[in-house]
């Protein structure tokens, strides 16, 4: 892969002497409303892909450097804008990292709600991935078939956080606010409607002969190559590797719920789609085990040095006002050291490596974003295939530019 500012010189040297009959085709920069701004310069011989150069950096926003300037709660505005299709998963991953650094134990109520929102976000992400993949291959109706259910999940997030997309969900030590009274009832209604909708979507798209011919055996990758590239999440499991952070390195209460890990066979575009279909059903299974068991209790830990007190108490209590002032002006202080924590985001292992010197901001932040590794493998996965198959491969990898470039 190359950064965008070097492409002119780089491509001029690499593709200077093309064999007779070969052409250069730009796949992208694509419109931001699709998968984000991505570009691939593809050398073709007829309809066959000979070579590919992937370009990154079009939406690079210096998030890691911003992490060294913002305090630990403020960095949520950056995690919101990584994989913007399932923002709560990014937020929860960051907050869990900071709580691990500070050894904060949140109430069970907080953990239950975080897990439920995580799985709802995973469902949203997979709906978009599989739905948009159908659109990219010419089947538009499947996406619309599930959009109603995705909208219902957005309404849950809007009521819970005040925002649909950039939710800044959670705070260090808990949640910004408690769940609303109809939270559990509305989620049960969503699950009730989503189950038959997934079955219908599968019949409409996945079982479609044309879709199968466009995706079966296309853009495949072996288990060994996937591991070598650093794959994780649905794309690794589609290659036949049953690895999931929720199972293999459990966090929150994932070791206390029952769910299966779907795996594929050849890591093809079809396998990646089928794995995501089954993962949506497994996410619903997890939510069903949690939704009726949300315990009573506070929505934050008893950590006044890191969690803002409620506004009504700030206005009437001197101690609460002091805590409020200290947190806003001096931030959350984290013990010195190096920390890494990973969670299973919708695209795979999302990890945060943080170096702290005991200040209100990290000394260094690095984000292990799963899309970065998939995009590196893309040229190898499409080499020798048809130009039209590059679209199916890219869609099934679910490369989100906001997460890729950070």
From Swiss-Prot:
<dbReference type="GO" id="GO:0005886">
    <property type="term" value="C:plasma membrane"/>
</dbReference>
<keyword id="KW-0520">NAD</keyword>
<protein>
    <recommendedName>
        <fullName>NADH-quinone oxidoreductase subunit D</fullName>
        <ecNumber>7.1.1.-</ecNumber>
    </recommendedName>
</protein>
<keyword id="KW-1003">Cell membrane</keyword>
<dbReference type="InterPro" id="IPR001135">
    <property type="entry name" value="NADH_Q_OxRdtase_suD"/>
</dbReference>
<keyword id="KW-0813">Transport</keyword>
<dbReference type="GO" id="GO:0051287">
    <property type="term" value="F:NAD binding"/>
</dbReference>
<comment type="subunit">
    <text>NDH-1 is composed of 14 different subunits. Subunits NuoB, C, D, E, F, and G constitute the peripheral sector of the complex.</text>
</comment>
<keyword id="KW-0830">Ubiquinone</keyword>
<keyword id="KW-1278">Translocase</keyword>
<comment type="similarity">
    <text>Belongs to the complex I 49 kDa subunit family.</text>
</comment>
<dbReference type="InterPro" id="IPR022885">
    <property type="entry name" value="NDH1_su_D/H"/>
</dbReference>
<dbReference type="Pfam" id="PF00346">
    <property type="entry name" value="Complex1_49kDa"/>
</dbReference>
<comment type="function">
    <text>NDH-1 shuttles electrons from NADH, via FMN and iron-sulfur (Fe-S) centers, to quinones in the respiratory chain. The immediate electron acceptor for the enzyme in this species is believed to be ubiquinone. Couples the redox reaction to proton translocation (for every two electrons transferred, four hydrogen ions are translocated across the cytoplasmic membrane), and thus conserves the redox energy in a proton gradient.</text>
</comment>
<dbReference type="InterPro" id="IPR029014">
    <property type="entry name" value="NiFe-Hase_large"/>
</dbReference>
<keyword id="KW-0874">Quinone</keyword>
<dbReference type="GO" id="GO:0050136">
    <property type="term" value="F:NADH:ubiquinone reductase (non-electrogenic) activity"/>
</dbReference>
<keyword id="KW-0472">Membrane</keyword>
<keyword id="KW-0997">Cell inner membrane</keyword>
<dbReference type="GO" id="GO:0048038">
    <property type="term" value="F:quinone binding"/>
</dbReference>
């Amino acid at each position: 892969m190359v950064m965008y500012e070097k492409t002119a010189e780089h491509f001029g040297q690499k593709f200077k002497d093309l064999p007779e009959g070969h052409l250069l085709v730009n796949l992208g920069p694509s419109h931001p409303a699709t998968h984000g701004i991505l570009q691939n310069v593809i050398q073709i011989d007829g309809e066959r892909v000979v070579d590919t150069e992937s370009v990154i950096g079009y939406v690079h926003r210096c998030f890691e450097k911003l992490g060294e300037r913002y305090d630990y709660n403020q960095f949520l505005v950056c995690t919101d804008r990584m994989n913007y299709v399932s923002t709560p998963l990014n937020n929860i991953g960051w907050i869990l990292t900071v709580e691990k650094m500070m050894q904060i134990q949140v109430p069970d109520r907080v953990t239950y709600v975080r897990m439920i929102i995580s799985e709802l976000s995973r469902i949203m992400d997979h709906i978009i991935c599989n739905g948009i993949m159908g659109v990219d291959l010419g089947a538009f109706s499947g996406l619309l078939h599930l959009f109603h259910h995705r909208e219902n999940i957005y309404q849950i997030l809007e009521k819970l956080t005040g925002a649909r997309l950039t939710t800044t969900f959670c705070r260090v030590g808990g949640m910004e606010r408690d769940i609303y009274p109809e939270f559990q009832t509305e989620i049960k209604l969503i699950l009730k409607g989503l189950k038959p909708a997934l079955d219908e979507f599968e019949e409409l798209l996945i079982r479609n002969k044309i879709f199968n011919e466009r995706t079966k055996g296309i853009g495949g990758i072996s288990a060994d190559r996937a591991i070598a590239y650093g794959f994780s999440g649905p794309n690794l499991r589609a290659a036949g590797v049953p690895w999931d952070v929720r199972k293999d390195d459990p966090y929150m209460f994932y070791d206390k719920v029952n769910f299966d890990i779907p795996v594929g066979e050849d890591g093809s575009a079809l396998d990646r789609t089928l794995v995501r279909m089954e993962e949506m059903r497994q996410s619903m299974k997890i939510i069903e085990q949690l939704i009726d068991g949300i315990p009573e209790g506070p929505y934050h830990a008893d950590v006044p040095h890191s969690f803002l007190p409620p506004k009504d108490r700030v206005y009437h209590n001197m101690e609460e006002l002091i805590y409020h002032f200290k947190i806003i002006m001096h931030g959350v202080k984290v013990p010195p050291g190096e920390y890494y924590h990973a969670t299973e985001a919708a695209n795979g292992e999302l990890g945060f490596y943080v170096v702290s010197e005991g200040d209100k901001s990290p000394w260094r932040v690095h984000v292990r974003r799963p899309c970065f590794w998939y995009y590196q493998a893309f040229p190898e996965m499409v080499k020798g295939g048809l130009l039209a198959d590059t679209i199916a491969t890219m869609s099934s990898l679910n490369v989100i530019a906001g997460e890729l470039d950070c």
